[in-house]
Amino acid sequence: MVKKNFIPSVSLVRRDLPTLVTTTTSSTALSKPTSSVVSETSSKSLPSLTSSAFSTSSGATSSSSLIVASITPPSTAGNPFILNAADKPNGTVYIAVGAVIGAIFISILIWWLVSSYLSRRFTMTNSYANDSKNLYRGHHKHSSSLQSNPFDINDEKSYMQDDWDSMSQLESSQYEDAASPFNPIQDPFTDNRRSLFISPTLQVSQYEKSHSRHQSKDTNIFIDDPFLYVGTYLEEEEEEEEERKLNLNRPQRAASPERKEKKINSMEGYHKRNQSSLGLIPVASATSNTSSPKKAHKRQAPSMFLDDVLNGREII
């Protein structure tokens, strides 16, 4: 038995396409949207799709009204509590604040300018004074350009004092040998010293003599200047007062000879109070009498002194 390929038979049935049906509805009142409605129609058992749309021809309108009140400021006429700003420009407060700040800045600027000018003037006058002092030292007549300055008299006095100091140093350097300027007491024989003995009194006297000699020469040179003469006179008076205080010119004895007399007088008064005759004896005889028994009496050993006490020879 031979098998054959079996081919099934298929019957094709023709189907029609679905039909689309559209319907429109209109209404005069408020319309609400309607959803599309799908209806099934049977046409040879095929579904059909139906859609509907809506359209509005008119709608309802509503109206509303809002009432707003108008605000009017009070009148300034006759009201003392309201500033009448009709006469004032706009921004009066800002203008006033700016004017105050500007006045403060202007005052600070003026103060800075004045202070800088005064300081510069002061430095210029000082520098001019120093230059004139260095250039015209030794001359007592300076230029008259500073006569308007109220400190001219003091400046002249200071110049005179400086000139006096410089000239005195020059004179002292002429008469003095090589000496240290830091030590006022100088010994001219320091290099040739052979002994180690130093006499402060001799050094002070030598210094006073040299100082008085130089001072007399300086006063003879500058005797025509009254200011310098008065200054030297005052310096001499101060030195004399210092010498009186120190008493360097008068030699003092180491021991006063009056001490023995005072001692004798005190001893006499003491013996008179005690009613003894020792005060009538001269001091030399009294000392000799008191020292003689000490010399005659020999020093004994402690054991011998104890034996004498026990034997009754000595009384404690």
From Swiss-Prot:
Spell out the residue ranges making up region: Disordered: 32-60, 240-304
The signal peptide annotation in the UniProt record is none
Q: Report biased composition (Basic and acidic residues) as residue ranges.
A: 256-271
What's any one GO cellular component for it? endoplasmic reticulum
Instruction: Keywords in alphabetical order, please.
Output: Membrane, Phosphoprotein, Transmembrane, Transmembrane helix, Vacuole
Spans traversing the lipid bilayer: 93-113
The record gives the membrane topology as: Single-pass membrane protein
The Phosphoserine modification is found at: 148, 256, 276
Task: Give its localization.
Answer: Vacuole membrane
User: Using the chain's own numbering, where are the disulfide bonds?
Assistant: none
Member of which family?
Belongs to the PRM5 family.
Q: What's the protein name?
A: Vacuolar membrane protein YNL058C
Q: Which organism is it from?
A: Saccharomyces cerevisiae (strain ATCC 204508 / S288c)
Its organism's taxonomic lineage begins at: Eukaryota, Fungi, Dikarya, Ascomycota, Saccharomycotina
